[in-house]
A protein has these predicted regions:
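Hydrophobic alpha-helical segments, especially N-terminal targeting/anchoring helices
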Residues: 36, 84, 118, 126, ...
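Rossmann-like dinucleotide-binding cores of NAD(P)H-dependent redox enzymes
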Residues: 1-2, 7-11, 17-78, 82, ...
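Short acidic-glycine loop/turn motifs at beta-strand connectors
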Residues: 78, 120, 233-235
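Conserved beta-strand segments of alpha/beta enzyme cores
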Residues: 32, 64, 90, 117, ...
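Residue-level structural signal for beta-strand termini and adjacent loop
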Residues: 48, 77, 96, 138, ...
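FAD-site-proximal beta/loop scaffold in flavoenzymes
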Residues: 1-7, 90-166
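Glycine/Thr-rich phosphate-binding loops of Rossmann-like dinucleotide-binding domains
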Residues: 20-21, 26, 43, 105-108, ...
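Flexible, glycine-rich terminal cap/loop adjacent to redox cofactors
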Residues: 165-166, 177, 182-293
């Protein structure tokens, strides 16, 4: 945060959400970027199709992506930094960003003495109204064991206050929480994932519609991205979705509402989006999931 100029060559260690976002941002600002990933693909915890699109865009835009490469050390040099990989290779750059995860700042502040239960990772255990194991103590935000998102933290804070004051509250349902990765293009997700459907955690049908088929996308030159919907095999209810697109964070809201109100794909398809618009791909995908009968 104290940089006075953009790095000439930024080495990013870690290809999770933070690493991918900063790598994308600095490449867009004109920095040479090398992304060191220990996994086979960037964003290993995200939708595989979405991660594939982002990695392809990264490489096409001139970013160097070193997959299956584990960084052993990063040291300062006379001209910048040198990252040494597990196989002995070295990468030289002007700056390095370490994006290899975070830990909650909950140690030695008296939580255990107060009877507040922690997870093995040090996060505070909370229920769906943000209350800890001690009835009069609440926790909100990244220190809790809920989703580490600003929207969730804000909702936890509101829920905790209302609940503590005796007001009626709706318990937080993390399955309905949308999240977004601010790369270019963005990745927005909500609900169940394709991995959970594929491994049998929940039954569902999957449909993916490339954004390149969208009229508005053609008008503005967007070729990368897609809309992917997940629906219950039994009822046709929308249970999840992934959008990879410019401003996907703005496009995901219809799917959030569909999941929150348990709309079917047919009900979603009956909505009238503006034509032409990127949001039209959502109803197009829903329409394609209709089962005749």
């Amino acid at each position: 945060y104290q940089l006075k100029e953009t790095p000439a060559h930024l080495i990013v260690v870690g290809s999770g959400v933070t690493g991918a976002e900063f790598a994308s941002a600095y490449r867009a600002l004109g920095s040479e970027v090398t992304l060191i990933s220990s996994r086979e693909q960037v964003l290993p915890g995200e939708d595989a199709d979405a991660a594939r699109v982002i990695e392809d865009v990264f490489k096409r835009n001139g970013m160097t992506v070193l997959s299956k490469s584990r960084a052993e050390s990063v040291k300062r040099s006379k001209t910048g930094v040198i990252a040494t990989l597990a196989d002995g290779r070295t990468v030289e750059g002007s700056h390095c960003l370490m994006a290899v995860g975070s830990i909650p700042n909950t140690e030695k502040i008296g939580l255990e003495e107060a009877g507040v239960q922690l997870t093995d990772s040090g996060h505070i255990r909370v229920n769906r109204v943000a209350r800890t194991s001690m009835p009069m103590i609440y926790a909100a935000g990244d220190c809790s064991d809920s989703l580490p998102l600003a929207s969730v933290a804000a909702m936890q804070g509101r829920t905790a206050v209302y609940h503590a004051m005796g007001d009626g509250v709706t318990p937080i349902e993390v399955r309905n929480v949308a999240s977004n990765i601010f790369t270019q293009p963005e990745i927005a997700t909500v609900g169940w994932s394709q991995k959970q459907i594929d491994d049998g955690t929940t039954p569902g049908n999957i449909y993916k519609l490339p954004l390149a088929s969208n009229p508005r996308a053609k008008m503005i030159g967007v070729k990368d991205g897609f809309v992917k919907l997940f629906a219950s095999t039994r009822s046709g209810t929308v249970i999840g979705g992934v959008i990879v697109a410019p401003h996907a964070s703005e496009l995901i809201m219809p799917l959030v509402l569909a999941i929150e109100h348990r709309l079917t794909v047919d009900q979603l398809a009956r909505a009238f989006p503006v034509y032409p618009s990127l949001s039209g791909s959502i109803t197009d995908a829903a329409r394609a999931m209709h089962i005749v009968g």
